[in-house]
Amino acid sequence: MLYYAAPMEGFTDRVWRQTHQKWFGAQGAADRYYAPFISPPENRVLIKKKMAELAPAANPGAPVIPQLLAKDGELAAWMIEQLRALGYTEVNLNLGCPAGTVTAKGKGSGMLRDLAKVDAFLDGVFSRAEGPVSVKTRLAKMIMLSLCAFIWKRRILLIIWKRHAKRMIFTANRR
């Protein structure tokens, strides 16, 4: 069985990843550590402090997967290029964050309200970005088939976090 460490903003940073590897060693360390999300800057100027979190030197030996939170496919593709330049082979797109501050901006699970926008976003990413890109999401019954069609069309590795699925179905039906 593979062990993936889920991202939790403000908790699973590089210090946590290093400590986890140190104390649990090769036998107990995660097979992958998903980094807390970063949003690509609209002005396309990287923020040094945020990029320091993902610097390979700050994550020695840790198989880290950067996670992007975006709603513009072209901008996300640009950010993926920047992460590839740092040596990352896989990048994860976050379509699952249920936080109100995120969904209000049409990002994370807020993007799932408009499947045409999801399709356009994924087209923007996959028409420009190269290499493996996975998608983290939460699935509500009403969108599962459509979203799976988008995923299948692009041969995306899909990661589903089940924990809040019931809450998401409830809140999605209220809107």
For each of these PLM feature ranges, what is it?
Residues 1-2, 31-32, 86:
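Intrinsically disordered, low-complexity segments enriched in small/polar residues
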Residues 1-2, 41-63, 97, 104-105, ...:
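N-terminal small/glycine-rich loop or linker at the start of catalytic domains
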Residues 3-6, 33-35, 64-68, 91-93, ...:
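Hydrophobic faces of well-ordered beta-strands that scaffold small-molecule active sites
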Residues 8-82:
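Glycine-rich, positively charged N-terminal anion/phosphate-binding segment
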Residues 14, 100, 112:
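Short, electropositive, low-hydrophobicity segments enriched in small/polar residues
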Residues 22-28, 77-91, 95-105, 116-175:
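Alpha/beta enzyme core
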Residues 70, 112, 116:
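Conserved phosphate-coordination/catalytic loops
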Residues 106-112:
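Short glycine-enriched, charge-decorated loop/helix-capping segments at active-site entrances
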